[in-house]
């Protein structure tokens, strides 16, 4: 997740909080020189849930998101 608009941080955090049961870990990196934040999030969720979450996040102003999927399939 790349955050270019600081005003979108609060709605982003709300979305992440609402989906916290899927979040394994989160790392935020402030890049002061470029005035952006880079956020990496590891999720354990069905692919459709991840896609929906990425869509919600990507619709926020000044935020872009990319997803990567593992080939590991859960038996849970």
Residue ranges and their predicted role:
Residues 1-76:
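Long, contiguous binding/interaction regions
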């Amino acid at each position: 997740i790349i955050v270019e608009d600081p005003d979108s941080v609060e709605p982003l955090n709300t979305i992440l909080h609402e989906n916290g049961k899927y979040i394994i870990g989160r790392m935020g990196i402030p890049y002061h020189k470029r005035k952006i934040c880079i956020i990496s999030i590891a999720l354990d969720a069905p692919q459709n849930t991840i896609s929906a979450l990425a869509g919600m996040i990507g619709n926020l102003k000044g935020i872009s998101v990319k997803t990567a999927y593992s080939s590991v399939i859960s038996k849970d």
